[in-house]
């Protein structure tokens, strides 16, 4: 991670950390670095945002920066991160930009870029952007006259994206009832339209954004209300998205939460059965539950692990020629259809598997059995001090000895927040609480 870029773009509290002035610079630098190869005509950049109150402020600042380097900007309005990634490619743009802080609370916001291929930027490109941001002098071009950039409104982009999603499934979903929790975020209007268009019976919650209620006790990080609604309506499936809808957490017909590990396992087995799982492999991260790996082994499906972050999952998928990967948090990547985690696409594929198999999600999830897992987030002053802290390392070693090879411990800094995550897995849920809290106590002593 760099000075500005975390694992998912630039983030901070809008108007204090992520200011309009910084957004202008990011637009100017990002627009230049990503489009300077353009030989003829103005470079094209698409831009979308979620529903945060600060989105319009940052969008206009970004726009000014992009226009100042001569870009033609296609404004999509409120749309998902995955919609921006798809439309960057579909519209032949040179770059894409999404304004969102994903699952973070509404005062935060963020900016992430996509290259012309729809993929997130590499560490190397982000490092170059940071060099320009920190340069003592702005040496980038300042076109004048007719070479100054222009803005094109393309609010039909959302419908174009939905048409693409519908083309990825062959089934119609009449007879299936789905509850959608839109997190008062980017797909508050798109999600219901998509699932109604494929004939599912749709019930929506968290679909009334007001600028400050995004992710507020709703969405993929708060699935409790979705569980209640699925049981209340006797639905076949519940789908919960985060603020920018690049992730999806499901709820089965019995009201049980189905996280990204389960979703990947279900989709991997379904793709393998059709002969469509590239290289018989699914890509996940170090956060995946031990039960996921055991379940895949029993299905004779290979797995490979990366660092946390869907960008690293995608890099490994491209390297190995794989088409399915994701994270426990619900970022699921179907590389045949999109270049990043896509909550709407994930939900649609799950519904398609339910319809094709004739089996409820509660039965499909039996492809794996989760090991008990406990995760505690500790808010700290400086997460960078985790590395090299001997007291914390010693606490981890002692807990690993207590698990005696029948479990695991993972302690890592968040890529997007001032948080250290302490996670342990093992066969005994009661034992885990004591083990994790031993490490948490040391983290608090050392870093808080």
Swiss-Prot record:
Cofactor: Mg(2+)
Gene Ontology biological process terms, A to Z: carbohydrate metabolic process; peptidoglycan biosynthetic process; UDP-N-acetylglucosamine biosynthetic process
Annotated residues for binding of Mg(2+): 102, 242, 244, 246
Reaction equations catalysed: alpha-D-glucosamine 1-phosphate = D-glucosamine 6-phosphate
InterPro entries with a match to the protein in the record: A-D-PHexomutase_a/b/a-I (IPR005844), A-D-PHexomutase_a/b/a-I/II/III (IPR016055), A-D-PHexomutase_a/b/a-II (IPR005845), A-D-PHexomutase_a/b/a-III (IPR005846), A-D-PHexomutase_C (IPR005843), A-D-PHexomutase_C_sf (IPR036900), A-D-PHexomutase_CS (IPR016066), Alpha-D-phosphohexomutase_SF (IPR005841)
Cellular component GO terms held in the UniProt record: cytosol
Modified residues (Phosphoserine): 102
Family the entry assigns: Belongs to the phosphohexose mutase family.
Name recorded for this polypeptide: Phosphoglucosamine mutase
Organism: Brevibacillus brevis (strain 47 / JCM 6285 / NBRC 100599)
Gene: glmM
């Amino acid at each position: 991670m760099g000075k500005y870029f975390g694992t998912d773009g630039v983030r901070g509290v809008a108007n204090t950390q992520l200011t309009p002035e910084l957004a202008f610079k990011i637009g100017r630098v990002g627009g230049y670095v990503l489009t300077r190869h353009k030989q003829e005509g103005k470079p094209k950049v698409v831009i979308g945002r979620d529903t945060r109150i600060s989105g319009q402020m940052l969008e206009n600042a970004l726009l000014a920066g992009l226009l100042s380097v001569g870009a033609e900007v296609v404004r999509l309005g409120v749309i998902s991160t995955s919609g921006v990634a798809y439309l960057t490619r579909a519209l032949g743009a040179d770059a894409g930009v999404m304004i969102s802080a994903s699952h973070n609370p509404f005062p935060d916001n963020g900016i992430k870029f996509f290259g012309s291929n729809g993929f997130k930027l590499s560490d190397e490109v982000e490092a170059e952007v940071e060099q320009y941001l920190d340069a003592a002098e702005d040496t980038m071009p300042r076109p004048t006259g007719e070479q100054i950039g222009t803005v094109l409104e393309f609010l039909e982009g959302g419908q174009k994206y939905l048409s693409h999603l519908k083309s990825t499934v062959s089934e119609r979903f009449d007879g299936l009832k789905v509850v959608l929790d839109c997190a008062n975020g980017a797909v508050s209007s798109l999600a219901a339209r998509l699932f109604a268009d494929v004939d599912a019976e749709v019930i929506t919650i968290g679909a009334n954004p007001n600028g400050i209620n995004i992710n507020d006790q709703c969405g993929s990080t708060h699935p409790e209300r979705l569980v209640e609604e699925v049981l209340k309506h006797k639905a076949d499936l519940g789908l919960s998205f985060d603020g920018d809808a690049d992730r999806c957490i499901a709820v089965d017909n019995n009201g049980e939460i189905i996280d990204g590990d389960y979703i990947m396992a279900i989709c991997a087995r379904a793709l393998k059965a059709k002969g469509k799982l590239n290289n018989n492999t699914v890509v996940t991260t170090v956060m995946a539950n031990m039960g996921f790996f055991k379940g895949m082994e029993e299905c004779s499906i290979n797995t490979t692990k990366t660092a946390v972050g869907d960008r690293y999952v995608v890099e490994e998928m491209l390297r190995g020629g794989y088409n399915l990967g994701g994270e426990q948090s619900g970022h699921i990547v179907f590389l045949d259809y999109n270049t990043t985690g896509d909550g709407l696409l994930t939900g649609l594929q799950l519904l398609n598997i339910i319809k094709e198999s004739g089996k409820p999600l509660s039965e499909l999830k039996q492809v794996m059995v989760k090991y008990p897992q406990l995760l505690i987030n500790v808010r700290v002053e400086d997460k960078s001090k985790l590395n090299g802290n001997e007291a914390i390392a010693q606490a981890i070693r002692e807990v690993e000895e207590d698990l005696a090879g029948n479990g695991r411990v993972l302690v890592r800094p968040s890529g997007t927040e001032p948080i250290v995550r302490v996670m342990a897995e093992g066969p005994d849920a009661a034992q885990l609480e004591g083990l994790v809290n031993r490490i948490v106590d040391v983290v608090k002593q050392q870093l808080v």
